[in-house]
Amino acid sequence: MSKEGLPTPKDVSGKGLRVAVVTATWNAEICDQLHRRALETAEAAGAIVTPLRVVGALELPVVVQAAARTHDAVVALGCVVRGGTPHFDYVCDSVTQGLTRIALDESTPVANGVLTVNDYEQAVDRAGFADSAEDKGAEAMQAALETVHTLRTLDESNLK
């Protein structure tokens, strides 16, 4: 798996930031690892974290929206593995559109860390295990924290 194009993470402080991590429970081994890595990244940055769980990916948007109203950022995590029916496409499209709409409607960063993979092996390779090529839980948290700082920079520049 290529990491080509992956941006270098900025050293951002999460001090004083309230961040929710909303994680689905389907594909528990993968989702638990994504959740753990997001929490570790937030705590290392000094953020105040609210961990939340939902059953599946389709339940993410409604809880993410509620969290977006009371937090500085939200990270949505889950794992959808392609099966033999179009259900995969419906779930992935609905979740992606829902999370994007929430971020725009609430003006709150929502990092989409929902893995959409062809097989379980691809999920393991992205979940941030010791032998994984990628760490999508940590990357989603990093993106959320950086986006909060970018929005605050915009707010400050509008005050001048």
Curated annotation (Swiss-Prot):
Its EC number is 2.5.1.78. Pfam families: DMRL_synthase (PF00885). CDD domains: Lumazine_synthase-I. Pathway: Cofactor biosynthesis; riboflavin biosynthesis; riboflavin from 2-hydroxy-3-oxobutyl phosphate and 5-amino-6-(D-ribitylamino)uracil: step 1/2. 5-amino-6-(D-ribitylamino)uracil binds at residues 26, 57-59, 79-81, 112. It comes from the Bacteria. Coiled coil: none annotated. Keywords: Riboflavin biosynthesis, Transferase. The active site is at 87 (proton donor). InterPro entries: LS, LS/RS, LS/RS_sf. One of its GO terms (molecular function) is 6,7-dimethyl-8-ribityllumazine synthase activity. Belongs to the DMRL synthase family. This is 6,7-dimethyl-8-ribityllumazine synthase. The gene is ribH.
